[in-house]
Design a protein with these regions (language model features):
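Beta-strand residues in well-ordered beta-sheet regions across diverse protein folds
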Residues: 83-84, 126
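Metal-dependent nuclease catalytic regions and adjoining charged, substrate-binding loops involved
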Residues: 101-103, 113, 117-174
């Protein structure tokens, strides 16, 4: 899931062990409830897909791209799908297609890697709004995907350095 994150952020997650330990310790009870709620809603999406008569297969299938292992959410009617629960703000990005311009969690890159491993050109997100229960489908065409192998090579190259990669943003706030 790190494939969509900036190289600098990934570099620090591997090279700053004190920060990693601190982040792990900062999860609270409510954080774990939010994670659980997200997993439950994603299971509801799978259930609803099956109940509506769709064929859901290859759930949590292990995939390998450029020696990196991942697990896809599944296939719905032979289309690669990632099930997501989202806040109303994030849900709107999937519904309107703005996710292709503003993807802070790297969802497109992750789905691109799964698509590359499956050798498919089309995929999509089935997303539920955690607040309203609204559901949308956001198709992802291969022209919107990244080359996952090249991206992994870029990450590896940056991790080999003892110096963090350059910032992908201005050091001076706007």
């Amino acid at each position: 899931s790190m494939i969509g994150q900036p190289n600098r952020k990934i570099w620090y997650s591997f090279n700053n062990k004190d920060d990693n330990k601190k982040q792990e310790e900062e999860f609270t009870g409510p954080d774990f409830i939010k994670f659980l709620y997200g997993h439950i809603l994603e299971s509801v999406l799978v259930f609803l897909s099956k109940t509506a008569g769709h064929k859901v297969s290859d759930r949590q299938k292990e995939l390998v791209v450029n020696d990196v292992v991942g697990h896809q959410d599944g296939m719905v009617d032979d289309v690669l799908v990632d099930f997501k629960s989202a806040s109303s703000f994030s849900f709107k990005k999937f519904k309107t297609g703005k996710i292709f311009q503003d993807d802070p969690f790297g969802y497109i890159a992750q789905l691109s890697a799964y698509a590359q491993a499956n050798e498919v050109k089309e995929a999509g997100f089935v997303v539920i709004d955690k607040t309203t229960g609204e559901i949308t489908y956001c198709p992802v065409h291969h022209m919107e995907m990244i080359n996952a192998e090249d991206r992994i090579d870029s990450i590896r190259e940056s991790l080999e350095s003892s110096i963090p990669p350059e910032r992908c943003y201005s050091a001076i706030p706007d």
